Protein backbone atom coordinates (compact mmCIF):
# COMPACT_ATOMS: atom_id res chain seq x y z
CA UNK A 1 0.00 0.00 0.00
CA UNK A 2 2.76 2.47 0.96
CA UNK A 3 4.80 1.46 -2.09
CA UNK A 4 1.79 2.13 -4.35
CA UNK A 5 1.19 5.53 -2.75
CA UNK A 6 4.84 6.52 -3.17
CA UNK A 7 4.84 5.32 -6.79
CA UNK A 8 1.72 7.41 -7.49
CA UNK A 9 3.22 10.48 -5.85
CA UNK A 10 6.49 10.02 -7.74
CA UNK A 11 4.56 9.83 -11.03
CA UNK A 12 2.61 12.98 -10.11
CA UNK A 13 5.85 14.77 -9.17
CA UNK A 14 7.44 13.77 -12.48
CA UNK A 15 4.44 15.03 -14.48
CA UNK A 16 4.26 18.26 -12.51
CA UNK A 17 8.02 18.75 -12.96
CA UNK A 18 7.57 18.48 -16.73
CA UNK A 19 4.70 20.96 -16.60
CA UNK A 20 6.80 23.33 -14.49
CA UNK A 21 9.75 23.06 -16.89
CA UNK A 22 7.49 23.84 -19.83
CA UNK A 23 5.52 26.78 -18.41
CA UNK A 24 7.86 28.05 -15.64
CA UNK A 25 4.82 29.31 -13.74
CA UNK A 26 4.68 30.10 -10.02
CA UNK A 27 1.37 28.22 -9.65
CA UNK A 28 2.99 25.12 -11.14
CA UNK A 29 5.88 25.57 -8.68
CA UNK A 30 3.44 25.73 -5.77
CA UNK A 31 1.76 22.47 -6.85
CA UNK A 32 5.18 20.86 -7.40
CA UNK A 33 6.28 21.84 -3.90
CA UNK A 34 3.01 20.50 -2.41
CA UNK A 35 3.47 17.12 -4.12
CA UNK A 36 7.05 16.86 -2.88
CA UNK A 37 5.91 17.76 0.63
CA UNK A 38 3.30 14.96 0.51
CA UNK A 39 5.95 12.51 -0.71
CA UNK A 40 8.38 13.43 2.07
CA UNK A 41 5.64 13.32 4.72
CA UNK A 42 4.78 9.77 3.62
CA UNK A 43 8.45 8.78 3.83
CA UNK A 44 9.02 10.33 7.26
CA UNK A 45 5.74 9.25 8.87
CA UNK A 46 6.03 5.69 7.65
CA UNK A 47 9.79 5.25 7.54
CA UNK A 48 9.59 2.39 10.05
CA UNK A 49 8.18 0.28 7.20
CA UNK A 50 11.48 0.55 5.34
CA UNK A 51 14.54 -1.40 6.42
CA UNK A 52 16.67 0.60 8.81
CA UNK A 53 19.82 0.41 6.70
CA UNK A 54 18.12 2.44 3.98
CA UNK A 55 17.98 5.34 6.38
CA UNK A 56 21.33 5.16 8.14
CA UNK A 57 24.49 6.82 6.94
CA UNK A 58 27.99 5.55 7.72
CA UNK A 59 27.85 6.97 11.23
CA UNK A 60 24.49 5.39 11.98
CA UNK A 61 22.52 8.62 11.66
CA UNK A 62 19.27 8.77 9.80
CA UNK A 63 20.16 9.70 6.21
CA UNK A 64 16.62 10.58 5.15
CA UNK A 65 16.49 13.78 7.21
CA UNK A 66 19.67 15.10 5.59
CA UNK A 67 18.21 14.27 2.19
CA UNK A 68 14.98 16.11 3.02
CA UNK A 69 16.96 19.23 3.96
CA UNK A 70 18.78 18.98 0.63
CA UNK A 71 15.49 18.63 -1.27
CA UNK A 72 14.10 21.69 0.57
CA UNK A 73 17.20 23.75 -0.24
CA UNK A 74 17.03 22.75 -3.91
CA UNK A 75 13.31 23.62 -4.02
CA UNK A 76 14.16 27.06 -2.64
CA UNK A 77 16.83 27.53 -5.32
CA UNK A 78 14.32 26.49 -7.98
CA UNK A 79 11.72 28.93 -6.66
CA UNK A 80 14.31 31.74 -6.64
CA UNK A 81 15.22 31.02 -10.25
CA UNK A 82 11.54 30.98 -11.28
CA UNK A 83 10.97 34.39 -9.71
CA UNK A 84 13.81 36.04 -11.62
CA UNK A 85 12.94 38.32 -14.51
CA UNK A 86 15.53 36.57 -16.68
CA UNK A 87 14.76 32.90 -16.10
CA UNK A 88 17.50 30.44 -17.05
CA UNK A 89 15.66 27.45 -18.53
CA UNK A 90 18.70 25.15 -18.20
CA UNK A 91 19.09 25.93 -14.50
CA UNK A 92 15.39 25.27 -13.94
CA UNK A 93 15.56 21.94 -15.79
CA UNK A 94 18.69 21.02 -13.84
CA UNK A 95 17.03 21.76 -10.49
CA UNK A 96 13.95 19.72 -11.41
CA UNK A 97 16.18 16.79 -12.40
CA UNK A 98 18.25 17.18 -9.23
CA UNK A 99 15.13 17.10 -7.04
CA UNK A 100 13.79 14.05 -8.87
CA UNK A 101 17.12 12.30 -8.35
CA UNK A 102 17.13 13.10 -4.64
CA UNK A 103 13.57 11.80 -4.25
CA UNK A 104 14.45 8.60 -6.09
CA UNK A 105 17.48 8.24 -3.83
CA UNK A 106 15.25 8.49 -0.75
CA UNK A 107 12.64 6.20 -2.31
CA UNK A 108 14.99 3.34 -3.25
Regions found by a protein language model. Name each.
Residues 1-40, 47-62, 74, 90:
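N-terminal intrinsically disordered, cationic/polar leader segments
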Residues 39-46, 62, 66, 97, ...:
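Alpha-helix boundary/capping detector
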